[in-house]
Swiss-Prot record:
This is 3-isopropylmalate dehydrogenase. Catalyzes the oxidation of 3-carboxy-2-hydroxy-4-methylpentanoate (3-isopropylmalate) to 3-carboxy-4-methyl-2-oxopentanoate. The product decarboxylates to 4-methyl-2 oxopentanoate. Pfam families: Iso_dh. The lineage of its organism: Bacteria, Bacillati, Actinomycetota, Actinomycetes, Bifidobacteriales. One of its GO terms (cellular component) is cytoplasm. It comes from Bifidobacterium longum (strain NCC 2705). Keywords: Amino-acid biosynthesis, Branched-chain amino acid biosynthesis, Cytoplasm, Leucine biosynthesis, Magnesium, Manganese, Metal-binding, NAD, Oxidoreductase.
Length: 343
């Protein structure tokens, strides 16, 4: 008898509500016979905030924690000041659920046009540390709005936090092309950079089959557009990862075919999977949004739960659909139906 997994579903705002159901349908079809899913929907996002001022009520967060994984659609609304939902919902979940790996695959599918003249075979993944660095909220400001104002942002890197994400990267590389590239700026950020390098060297000794090298962040951004096929697993910190993942999305043709995961690799808390596109309020409710990225986020969820064969069904169906029909104009529902029909 197949095990039942509990999935927290946060459709969010805009097109998130339209694409998330297709991720759920893909989950169910791909895992048919090997896993069952029980969903709990959460009304969180811009619409909820505008309605009653709630961002992430404590009782709802506790219910989310009781699930095996989280599917997120998209969150955002131009009526809300930037940073409110990002910090109050997305970052709060990431930190409270200790989702210390931000995983962003980047693959150029046949049928998708890259902005690069000669992109080559692009298929790499960025492993970004997700709970430390400059995004952990350390810092402050004094004498605001005066000529003497001082503002600081403090980057915090711990050996514990770095080592666990380094180990994740090497384990992932063993399933791929067995190469890890550390990206940092250790010639300037000498304290953090040195610690990252030493830990990579130490962990690398435990994985003799995996080669590893190093690039400064500025060099890496150049190689991402001049020779992206050289990369397999890119390992980096929170800030540099934020920059590289956006660039990575652009070289494979944009956000329409890209998903990401915020991973708690210890499984102490649920991990969260989502398309990287936004809520796109300009096309919301018009059945125009492409659900492919949301469906790919379902594949990442299956991989995280250990159902690699089921995830492969989704990947194979998506690749075939994009190659044959990716350039055609289709509705949200038609794209979803076409992909599911190939599974």
């Amino acid at each position: 008898m197949a095990k039942t997994y509990k999935i927290a579903v946060i459709p969010g705002d805009g097109i998130g509500k339209e694409v998330t159901p297709w991720a759920q349908k893909a989950l169910e079809k791909a895992a048919e016979g090997v896993a069952d899913f029980e969903y709990e929907n959460f009304d969180l996002g811009a619409e909820r905030y505008l309605r009653d001022g709630a961002i992430l009520p404590e009782d709802e967060e506790e219910r989310i924690k009781a699930n095996d994984a989280i599917l997120l659609g998209a969150v955002g609304d131009p009526r809300i000041k930037a940073g409110i939902l990002e910090r109050g919902l997305l970052l709060k979940l990431r930190f409270d659920l200790d989702q210390y790996v931000n995983l962003r695959p980047s693959k150029l599918y046949k049928g998708v046009t890259s902005p690069l003249a000669n992109p080559g075979d692009i298929d790499f993944v960025v492993v970004r540390e997700g709970t430390e660095g400059l995004y952990c909220g350390a810092g402050g400001a004094v004498r605001r709005n005066t000529p003497q104002e001082v503002a600081t942002e403090v980057s915090i890197n711990t050996a514990y936090g770095v080592e666990r994400v380094v180990r994740y990267a090497f384990k992932l590389a063993m399933k791929r092309k067995k190469h890890v590239t550390l990206v940092h700026k250790k010639n300037v950020l000498v304290n953090a950079g040195d610690m990252w390098q030493r830990i990579v060297d130490k962990v690398g000794e435990e994985y003799p089959e995996v080669t590893h090298d190093y690039q400064h962040i500025d060099a890496a951004t150049i190689f991402l557009v001049s020779d992206p096929s050289r990369f397999d697993v890119i390992l980096t910190d929170n800030l540099f990862g934020d920059i590289l993942t956006d660039e990575a999305g652009s070289v494979v043709g944009g956000v329409g075919y890209s998903a990401s995961g915020c991973i708690n690799a210890s499984d102490e808390f649920p991990s969260m999977f989502e398309p990287i596109h936004g809520s796109a309020p300009d096309i919301a409710g018009q059945n125009k949004a492409n659900p492919t990225a949301a469906i790919l986020s379902a594949a990442m969820l299956l991989e995280h739960l250990g159902f690699d064969d089921a995830a492969k069904k989704i990947h194979t169906a998506v690749e075939a659909d994009i190659e044959e029909l990716g350039s055609t104009v289709r509705s949200t529902d038609q794209v979803g139906k076409d992909i599911l029909a190939r599974m």
